[in-house]
Amino acid sequence: MASQILDRDLHIRAIDAFIDPSVPRERAIITHGHADHARSGHGAVLATPDTIAIMKVRYGEDCAGRFEPLDFGVPLQIDDVTITFFPAGHVLGSAQVLVEQGGQRVVVTGDYKRLPDRTSQPYELVECDLLVTEATFGLPVFQHPHPSIEI
């Protein structure tokens, strides 16, 4: 079952890593550089190179013990877990995190945007067994205008 890969708080049990943790962790996987996802004080940060650059500008060069850059589409094997980033289309460097273990595929995404623009890498649809997504504006009360008239 795909949900057994993740615990509460987006904790990947098998590798003791947290996705977008709100408190400092020994191993953090960061989806993008906005302050509600990227925070300082982690032991190690796995993120796209652009997200790491944003974090260093925002929080300082030494805002984490170490940085592990991972490009889009490049699988990283850690024990029996594979982590791969795919563009989320939200901001420069924003990533969806594909976590694979035991034949199961879980995608965790912070903010994302499906329509392409020139400020970020375009969103890519990722096949998965379970999708965990942010829903800041997911309630029906939020009605956004079409992007062509919004800007």
Residue ranges, per PLM feature:
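His/Asp/Glu-rich metal-coordinating catalytic cores
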Residues: 2-12, 18-23, 27, 33-151
